[in-house]
Amino acid sequence: MFSGSNSYLGGNSGRQPPQQQPQQQQQYGGFQPNQGFQPQQTGFQPQQTGFQPQPTGYGNVAPLQPNFTGYPLQAQPTGYSQPPQSGFPGGQQQFNNAPQQQSFQTGAPPMPQIPQQFQQQPQQIQQAQPSPAAPVQQPQATGFAAMADSFKSASEPSKPRGRRASKGGAKIPSIRLSFITAQDQAKFETLFKSAVGDGQTLSGEKSRDLLLRSKLDGNSLSQIWTLADTTRSGQLHFPEFALAMYLCNLKLVGKSLPSVLPDQIKNEVSSMVDIINFAIEDDGPAGTNAPSFDSRQSTATPPTIQQPQPMPSNSALLTAQMTGFPGQQNNFSGGFQSQPTGFQSSMQTGFPGQQGGLQPQPTGFSQNMSNPQATGYTGPRPPMPPMPSNFSSNLSPAQTGMQGGMIAPLNSQPTGVPGQWGLVNAPATGLPNIDLLQSRMMPQQGREQGNFTTAGITGNAVIPWAVTKEEKTRYDSVFKAWDGFGKGFIGGDVAIEVFGQSGLEKPDLERIWTLSDHGNKGKLNMDEFAVAMHLIYRKLNGYPLPAQLPPELVPPSTRNFNDSIGAVKSLLHQESDFRKNSGATLLPQKTGLKKKVREKQVLLDAIDFKDENAADEDDALDRKDRREAEDLYRRIRRIQEDIDAHPDASLRNVDSGAERRAMKRQLQTLTDKLPDIASRVRRTERSIADAKLELFRLKDAKAHPGSASSIVGTGPGGAVTESDRLKARAKAMMQQRSAALTGKKIEISNDDLDAPKRLEEENLKIRTEKENNERMVQDVEESVRDFSRGLEDSLKDGGESSSSEHEKRRWEDGLGVEDEVKDFIFDLQRSSRSAKVRTDDRSREAPTETSRVSSAPAARSETPSSQPSSTPTPSAGTYSQYKTAEDRAAYIKQQAEQRMAERLAALGIRAPSKPGETTQQRLEREKNERAAKLKQAEEEDARREAERQARIAEEQGVAPHTPDQPKEITKKPPPPPSRKAARSDASERKFEEDRILKEQKSQIIATNELEDDAQRQENELAKEREAAQARVKALEEQMKAGKLKKEEEKKKRKALQAETKQQEARLAAQRAEIEAAQARERELQRQLEAIDDSDSSDDDEGPEQVTPQASTPTQGSQEFERKEASPPPPPPSVPVIVSPVPAAATTTSLPPPTPQVTSPVVSPPAETETRNPFLKKMAQSGDASAASTASNNPFHRLPSQELPAPAPIQVQPTGNRPSRVRPEEDDWDVVGSDKEDDSSDDEGPGAGGARHLASILFGTMGPPRPLSAMGNEATSAPHSPAAASPPVASPPPPPPMPSAGAPGGPPPPPPPPPPGMGAPPPPPMPPMGGAPAAPPAGGRPAGFLGEIQMGKALKKTQTKDKSAAATAGRVLD
């Protein structure tokens, strides 16, 4: 019927070269741009090319874009320039004044959409051509109003689309919100309407401006927005806005914002939001796939139109001729295909002379043309080669008219609506590389490696936006190949493999997935997969990916779903409007009420059935619970009977809390003593370390006389201070000066550098030992702490917590339980008490018989309160003897005391009482135990004291005095009773308890086993305590041994100090002699220089030379005083020593006369004794008292008695020389004795010796000083004796001599160190005795030098330890 004719005027013909434009204008010779033909009633407007378009379709046809005809140099728009409207209502067509009416109102067949890249080509081509502007085409008055409207330009404003079109302001339903008041809701409505204007929602910006006025912080406002925006649309409906204002009010009044909205508020807001959304009408037209130039956001640029190759000759081409105008078809030789456009019986349009209906009008090219056009549908049509126009819309020919004289409407061909998804034909140029792309996308081996590139599948072909049918077929086959299980979709992991085979970049594939996966489902169905593949194909051919999916690529499933939602909303809205306007909502609906009644009846029946089933189940559960409860009651009764029958049942009511608290207090008391003991041990360790260091210094000084260790440190901890170093340097300088005078070289020992090293090594050793002991103490302390913590934890673990106490009160007293359970508990208690009474009655006979046999009748006549004390320890039948509550309480208390005693005994503490005996027996036993312990303690103390005295005697080498020891022993109080007795008592009690338990029933066997376990634990604890006590005793023994060693070291130290003092005295004497010699040499020099002034010089030099007398012999004088204080025989020796004073004064020459010595000596010692408090006592007591005092001292008694013998030996050699220093020595002695009152015996001489050495050093450096320049110590007392001395001695030089002699006499050591007193004095005496023989051998200087040389032998026995005084003082402290 419609055999293969083209449906569109011009089809998809290509452009002709622009060079043909002048010829075409000549062919249309009378047509100017502003003229044209008159509008005819055919609905066609004059075309720019001179042809008038013909209606080739039906109404409701989508807009056809202008197609290009095959005329060279001129684009021939043969389609509609604007979308035609449906039908030809009332339209008339006039062809050469032959009006024909066509009125066909039929549905138009679907027509394919022209691709978007070709929709703007006519305008672009026409703009590029230099042709004059085309006249404005006016619509013809044919009555087609809809068609005229469709030809409006796209720039006209279009109505807003979507369901939220403004309809004169916000519509707020009259629904009351429960979370705000009516006044607040009215205010919020007013505010919302004023802010939102004509819309329905409040935008985010306006919402922010309103909410910021609340002056809340950003975090609160952010939380309020999150809670209020329930739809998550970024906009607020009125209920959401009211909710936001409500939350702001909550925050302003100080309340906290909820983290999640309450369900009631959330439901109200959501319901009101849904009502508002449904109330908005859907006014927008239905979606269409027609391309919109205004809304097009694709950045794709249409491909440039390539100019075709020029034709070889224009003669083969037919010139274009306007259709529908008479007189223009003469130039055509039948080259157009006839196209029926009306009734065949009508006149031919465009061909004069023809009558009778509309004749087919040629609208295309002749069949002999080489470039026919394709016009859309690929149905049955004659094969035609493609035109060289590079446009491949491939529109198929469609039947557009009627044939014959049929009056029926024209039938439409299936050409499709432009833009319809999946029904677009492939372009004329085909789809290049589509086969390669399909094969590449198919599942294949080796795809796991992912080495895919775009090589071989890229190109620059023209691809339409819509998916063509060929593409859809291929993409569906690829989809089915990958969807092996037939799920209808592929997941993301499969899509990664499929799309990755295309070789595109990852960002492009991600964008393609985002565009294809509508709704972000994470999977693609068949249509979405085709969209993704189409986008990949376009990307491979050089097209960029769009920002959003164009309408042509929206899958039908998605579009239909959205349309369905819109349709449902429209229906709901229409129904609600109808019911609201008609008032149907207010009228009751009978059918609805009946339906509800039936539904409720069904629900009630179901509830009744459910309740019956639940009741049956509850009954079954109740019966089961009752059986289980009864079974549990029976088991509890059996267990209670077993508990009552147990022999230790009477002990379960004992209050263990009091016992536990008492043990805690005792443990705390013992723990508190630990720090004090540890601190005492540490102090003892420090004192021992200091003593060891001092002892090493003394031994080192004795072993190395010339070593640097002779420097005694007087600083803290025995550190050597700067003053100590000055003293040592002064002493060394004195030695060097004396060596210079004698002419002998002093050998400096090499030990000076080794002394600090030895001291440091010893100090390190002592410190290491001290640290080891400290670690031991810390270990002991830590172990004791751990032990105490363990005991405390064990006591705590056994204690009752609040929860256990609550449970006890609940299940024993029946508090907080049901009545049935409470009755059961009381029943158990009653049965338990009755069982106890029965067992006590049965077991009373045996204990009563044993008690009658063992105890006296007086014990049986005791009151019930005293009976519990006589009853044996835990037994099953003893509790039944006591009927009253007082007796039972006393019995329980007695049992608790026994257990406490056992625990205390295990801890080593004496138990208060012993079980199984009366009070009188207990008192007698305790008395005997105390007596035995006291006797044992005394014996042990005596033994220890004897051992200590024996050790002391062995270390001292002297047997201890027997009369003194017993006194000390008896004076000492007896030590506390040892813990061994307590432990023995505990073991005895345990043994007796075991014996008593064996005599009772066989049921006690289990109790014995438990007690044995407890006993083993207690024994282990006792062993641990014994070990701890042994360690403590060992530490005590070490402390005692350390004390003994310290005492011995003190004694040795004192002896060494005495020796060093003697040696210092000898050294002082030698120094005095040296100074005297120097003074005499200076005096002789002065006498030689000034012979005339000899008398005056003698008077002046006298007192100057007295200064060395007072300054130098201090050590000797002090030692001499101490010597006098200790032994009785010193008086005869003292006069001999002092007598040389006048002799030396009278004789300036070398030999001092001895007879003059005796006269002045006696008086000064008396003054010295009266001024010294110690010497006063000695003088008052006399010789006998002195002897008795010496005998009372156990340490100095023997040496003091032996002193008289060596005294005369010392006096004889020294008596010749030193006599003049006597008064000065007395003065210094008094000062020294005053000092000794404040300081210890050891500190005095040490400090004095240092000062004397300094004074000697500085005295020898400068000229002699007068008496007025002396220290304060020698000013008061020495003046009187000094005055007496000058008249006796005429020359001043002799005073230094007596100083040399004076120290020679006092070498005997002071009383404190007796052991070394006798031995040291003799060695210095021989050189002193030999001294007088030397002077007469030569002249005066030679005599003095000879005496000094004779004293040189003293250096061999001299110890250069200067630390004696300071060290002794520190030890005494």
Curated annotation (Swiss-Prot):
Belongs to the PAN1 family. The gene is pan1. Component of the PAN1 actin cytoskeleton-regulatory complex. This is Actin cytoskeleton-regulatory complex protein pan1. One of its GO terms (molecular function) is actin binding. GO terms for cellular component: actin cortical patch; cytoplasm; endosome membrane; plasma membrane. Residues 216-251, 504-539 form the EF-hand domain. Residues 1-170, 283-309, 339-359, 764-812, 828-882, 903-1373 are annotated as: Disordered. InterPro entries: DUF1720, EF-hand-dom_pair, EF_hand_dom, EH_dom. It is found in: Cell membrane; Endosome membrane; Cytoplasm, Cytoskeleton, Actin patch. Residues 1340-1357 form the WH2 domain. Residues 1090-1103, 1224-1244 have a biased composition (Acidic residues). Residues 1-59, 81-105, 114-141, 299-308, 348-359, 861-880, 1135-1149, 1156-1166, 1277-1287 have a biased composition (Low complexity). Residues 837-847, 922-954, 982-1001, 1013-1050, 1072-1086 have a biased composition (Basic and acidic residues). Residues 289-298, 1106-1118, 1182-1194 have a biased composition (Polar residues). It holds the Pfam family EH. The keyword rRNA-binding does not apply. Residues 1288-1335 have a biased composition (Pro residues). Keywords: Actin-binding, Cell membrane, Coiled coil, Cytoplasm, Cytoskeleton, Endocytosis, Endosome, Membrane, Repeat. Residues 184-272, 471-560 form the EH domain. It is a peripheral membrane protein.
